[in-house]
């Protein structure tokens, strides 16, 4: 455990030895300030983009409704990150497929699996009985299916959208993972091999749209049967959006420099760009530019407050800060030590800015939903601090109940909706505040994924017990056994999430809002796949961010 010394008292100096995270500094610094004057697409690029869009729209409309051609075109458009241009056309096509699903369930493995996955991905619950024809008398998938590599990959992706009680999809997932790994070394098609390798690590269910779009454009270009119009449109659209995202990050960097929080709080992770990346994974579309910047600011504060409770603040200070957050009044800052005053005042200032921005749409009252969730997050962090200072390892049930707050995902969901326009009504904010099962599943997934990859490092520096320690302590198992069990628990929460997604009335809770919840969960799957890539962003995340936010596609 590394220690640091810091002067913290507001009225007189008291030197206190504290824990430190020893986090590496920002990798980006002022880099994105260089894009402040970056121009968007010029007139020629805009016209080319519109022309290509109309060509693709015609392709989509002209493809026969009940054809494999239509299925594959929709899939390609989605994988190339272009679906947001054609949402109404895709919605109409998938609605037709849903009402005529039996017609699609008589094709080959690839066609059935692709249709099944596209419909479930859209929120339509369709039966998995169509896959029974591919099993033998013992209920096992037929070995001959391995000859159909495309079909196997489609079945693998389809099985990811399973819910509780669908044994055939559980079997399909195990079967395809095993067989695809065996097939890989024998494939002569390098493009297909790359695609399978990526899918085994990042299935479509877990994929961040912009990250997977960048990869798929490369895969698609290598495919000899690619459509040049689609490829050209995907490249141009990717670069146009990237320019917008660079400009947003330039704005965020100016905001970050103006606050100077990092210089004041050296113990905290300086991860502005990584916060923005997280929010970009939630929604990338141009109409959510303001929403992304709001969400990034709140995400940045969540990170700082998390570090304050996890490693730096003393229990008496954390008690005062928790009380101040509950009061939510600038006068409450007077009782705080200096470093906490800075956090508190800047946090309230950011919420004031958001409230003023939403006042233009008569939506300022919605900010209270985000503030209430911030209070819950801080209560959760404070509970963990009390466990730590009391040397208590809670039962898993206690820990997971508190994890709904400490995941901060209801706060992020609520904040992500603030600037999404009229689609985000008071009713949807009331709904998420009740902690519905879908949202709780998302919270638990992020909490457990984070704990699996970060608990060893956190225990070295002296953090509160994670889910791993809680499980080991309660059930008297080894760390390895706890990891295996927690992985199973995560899979069950994904089944909960899928199941609830199919049940939600999308007239009341529009799909575009539900996708914020799902996309936040996808970002967690990505960030915590092999390590805590947010904290240790210099290892692998830096290159991904460069691909998405720095380097255009040539």
UniProtKB/Swiss-Prot annotation:
<dbReference type="GO" id="GO:0000287">
    <property type="term" value="F:magnesium ion binding"/>
</dbReference>
<keyword id="KW-0456">Lyase</keyword>
<feature type="binding site">
    <location>
        <position position="306"/>
    </location>
    <ligand>
        <name>Mg(2+) 1</name>
    </ligand>
</feature>
<dbReference type="InterPro" id="IPR001906">
    <property type="entry name" value="Terpene_synth_N"/>
</dbReference>
<dbReference type="GO" id="GO:0010333">
    <property type="term" value="F:terpene synthase activity"/>
</dbReference>
<feature type="binding site">
    <location>
        <position position="306"/>
    </location>
    <ligand>
        <name>Mg(2+) 2</name>
    </ligand>
</feature>
<dbReference type="InterPro" id="IPR008949">
    <property type="entry name" value="Isoprenoid_synthase_dom_sf"/>
</dbReference>
<feature type="short sequence motif" description="DDXXD motif">
    <location>
        <begin position="306"/>
        <end position="310"/>
    </location>
</feature>
<dbReference type="InterPro" id="IPR034741">
    <property type="entry name" value="Terpene_cyclase-like_1_C"/>
</dbReference>
<dbReference type="InterPro" id="IPR050148">
    <property type="entry name" value="Terpene_synthase-like"/>
</dbReference>
<comment type="pathway">
    <text>Secondary metabolite biosynthesis; terpenoid biosynthesis.</text>
</comment>
<feature type="binding site">
    <location>
        <position position="310"/>
    </location>
    <ligand>
        <name>Mg(2+) 2</name>
    </ligand>
</feature>
<dbReference type="InterPro" id="IPR008930">
    <property type="entry name" value="Terpenoid_cyclase/PrenylTrfase"/>
</dbReference>
<dbReference type="Pfam" id="PF01397">
    <property type="entry name" value="Terpene_synth"/>
</dbReference>
<dbReference type="GO" id="GO:0016102">
    <property type="term" value="P:diterpenoid biosynthetic process"/>
</dbReference>
<comment type="function">
    <text>Sesquiterpene synthase involved in the biosynthesis of volatile compounds. Mediates the conversion of (2E,6E)-farnesyl diphosphate (FPP) into gamma-gurjunene, (E)-beta-farnesene and (+)-valencene, and of (2Z,6Z)-farnesyl diphosphate ((ZZ)-FPP) into (E)-alpha-bergamotene and (Z)-gamma-bisabolene as well as beta-bisabolene, (Z)-alpha-bergamotene and (E)-gamma-bisabolene to a lower extent. Can act with a low efficiency as a monoterpene synthase with geranyl diphosphate (GPP) as substrate, thus producing beta-myrcene, (E)-beta-ocimene, limonene, terpinolene, gamma-terpinene and (Z)-beta-ocimene.</text>
</comment>
<dbReference type="InterPro" id="IPR044814">
    <property type="entry name" value="Terpene_cyclase_plant_C1"/>
</dbReference>
<protein>
    <recommendedName>
        <fullName>Terpene synthase 17</fullName>
        <ecNumber>4.2.3.73</ecNumber>
        <ecNumber>4.2.3.47</ecNumber>
        <ecNumber>4.2.3.106</ecNumber>
        <ecNumber>4.2.3.-</ecNumber>
        <ecNumber>4.2.3.54</ecNumber>
        <ecNumber>4.2.3.81</ecNumber>
        <ecNumber>4.2.3.15</ecNumber>
        <ecNumber>4.2.3.114</ecNumber>
        <ecNumber>4.2.3.113</ecNumber>
    </recommendedName>
</protein>
<comment type="similarity">
    <text>Belongs to the terpene synthase family. Tpsa subfamily.</text>
</comment>
<keyword id="KW-0460">Magnesium</keyword>
<keyword id="KW-0479">Metal-binding</keyword>
<feature type="binding site">
    <location>
        <position position="310"/>
    </location>
    <ligand>
        <name>Mg(2+) 1</name>
    </ligand>
</feature>
<dbReference type="InterPro" id="IPR036965">
    <property type="entry name" value="Terpene_synth_N_sf"/>
</dbReference>
<dbReference type="GO" id="GO:0016114">
    <property type="term" value="P:terpenoid biosynthetic process"/>
</dbReference>
<feature type="binding site">
    <location>
        <position position="458"/>
    </location>
    <ligand>
        <name>Mg(2+) 3</name>
    </ligand>
</feature>
<dbReference type="Pfam" id="PF03936">
    <property type="entry name" value="Terpene_synth_C"/>
</dbReference>
<dbReference type="InterPro" id="IPR005630">
    <property type="entry name" value="Terpene_synthase_metal-bd"/>
</dbReference>
